[in-house]
């Protein structure tokens, strides 16, 4: 079984990832050296724990977002997806097929001048009945 990570390790790892995401990798030894360069970590075991958690989070970040970590690249990607507008609307149709009852209801609601309305015969299947 693994060990429980302290609040200090988790917070330090998240801050390091947010600031130095582009320099970090999925390799523990590389991340250990980067943590040593960018942060003042008092003890060697604490540095190794932070580097291990950074490596763990980098693996999770590769697949999806991690709660509590905001990376500019992911923010920009999310912003682009949210603001995407297709060239042709999926809701726009040239012909809308309606039956007689629906057309009458639209006429009563003053929607009788909608373009593309086409009257169709309702499909009456006698399911389960034999001739």
Curated annotation (Swiss-Prot):
| Gene Ontology BP terms | cytoplasmic translation
Question: Does the keyword section mention Ribosomal protein?
Answer: yes
InterPro entries, per database record: Ribosomal_eS17, Ribosomal_eS17_CS, Ribosomal_eS17_sf
Give me the disulphide-bonded residues: none
Q: Which Gene3D superfamilies match?
A: Ribosomal protein S17e-like (1.10.60.20)
Record's keyword annotation contains Ribosomal protein? yes
Q: Which family does it belong to?
A: Belongs to the eukaryotic ribosomal protein eS17 family.
Name this protein carries in UniProt: Small ribosomal subunit protein eS17
Gene Ontology annotations for the cellular component aspect, listed alphabetically: cytosolic ribosome; cytosolic small ribosomal subunit
In terms of Pfam families, this protein maps to: Ribosomal_S17e
Molecular functions (GO terms): structural constituent of ribosome
**Protein keywords:** Ribonucleoprotein, Ribosomal protein
